[in-house]
Regions:
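A glycine- and Lys/Arg-enriched "phosphate-lid" helix/loop adjacent to the NTP-binding pocket
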Residues: 84-179
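P-loop (Walker A) phosphate-binding loop of NTP-binding proteins
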Residues: 4
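Glycine-rich phosphate-binding loop used to anchor ATP phosphates in small-molecule kinases
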Residues: 47-99, 106, 114
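Hydrophobic anchor at the beta1->P-loop junction of P-loop NTPases
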Residues: 1
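Conserved lysine of the Walker
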Residues: 9
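Short glycine/proline-enriched coil/turn segments at helix->beta-strand junctions
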Residues: 18-22, 64, 99-100, 141-142
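A structural signal for short, well-ordered beta-strand segments and their strand-loop junctions
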Residues: 24-26, 68-70, 106, 146-148
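Conserved substrate/cofactor phosphate-moiety recognition/catalytic segment
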Residues: 14-57
Length: 180
C-alpha cells in the first residue's frame, strides 16, 4: 500500500485483511512519532525503513499462509525521505524490497482530506506525495505490479477486483456477527 496522508490506506488495508484472512503490517513511522512525540530527522529515516521491513518480514514468518497487507509498504518511507528531506539515498533499497511484494496498491488522493491526530501537512502535501509517487512508477513497475486505487466509494471492492485479475481470488465474505 502506498499513497500520501489521508488517501484511505489504513481503511483499505483493514478491509482487505478482513476479507482474506490477512494480516496488516502497521506503520513504523507512526510508531516512531507516537514514541518520540515528533517526526523523524533525516538521519533517522534509514532506521525507520529497516523497522518497517522488519515488521513485514515478521508478519510473513508468523503468518506464512496469510495475505500480508503493508500499511504502508516500506517504499513510502523512502518516498517521504525524498519528499521531506530531498534525500533519495533510500530509493534503491526500497526498490529491492518492493520486488518481494506480489503487488503494490497506490491509493490516490481523490477522496476528501480527513485530518488524523499527529498529521500536520494537509491536502497540499498529500498532492506533492502523490506527484512524487507518480515519478517513481517506472521503477516500481519493474519491481512489482502497481495497481491504482481511485474513487470515493468502493475502494475495497476495486482493490479486490484488481487483485483477483492479477492473482485469482483469495477473498471470502466476512462472517456475520453473532449476537450471543
Amino acid at each position: 500500500m502506498i499513497g500520501g496522508e489521508s488517501t484511505g490506506k489504513t481503511t483499505l488495508a483493514l478491509g482487505l485483511a478482513a476479507t482474506s484472512h490477512g494480516v496488516v503490517v502497521s506503520e513504523a513511522l507512526r510508531a516512531f512519532v507516537d514514541d518520540h512525540g515528533r517526526t523523524p530527522l533525516p538521519e533517522e529515516q534509514h532506521s525507520i525503513l529497516l523497522a518497517q521491513r522488519s515488521r513485514e518480514i515478521a508478519a510473513s514468518q508468523d503468518h506464512p499462509h496469510a495475505t500480508i497487507v503493508c500499511d504502508p509498504a516500506t517504499t513510502m518511507t523512502a518516498i517521504y525521505s525524498e519528499l521531506y528531506f530531498n534525500d533519495s539515498s533510500l530509493r534503491m533499497q526500497a526498490m529491492e524490497y518492493a520486488a518481494d511484494y506480489d503487488a503494490i496498491l497506490w491509493c490516490r488522493p481523490d477522496i476528501p482530506w480527513v485530518a488524523e491526530p499527529g498529521q500536520h501537512d494537509g491536502p497540499q502535501f498529500r498532492e506533492a506525495a502523490d506527484l512524487l509517487i507518480s515519478q517513481w512508477l517506472d521503477d516500481l513497475r519493474v519491481a512489482t505490479p502497481v495497481l491504482e486505487i481511485t474513487g470515493t466509494q468502493g475502494r475495497i471492492l476495486m482493490a479486490r477486483d484488481l487483485l483477483d485479475a492479477q492473482f485469482g481470488s483469495v477473498w471470502q465474505q466476512p462472517a456475520p456477527h453473532s449476537s450471543t
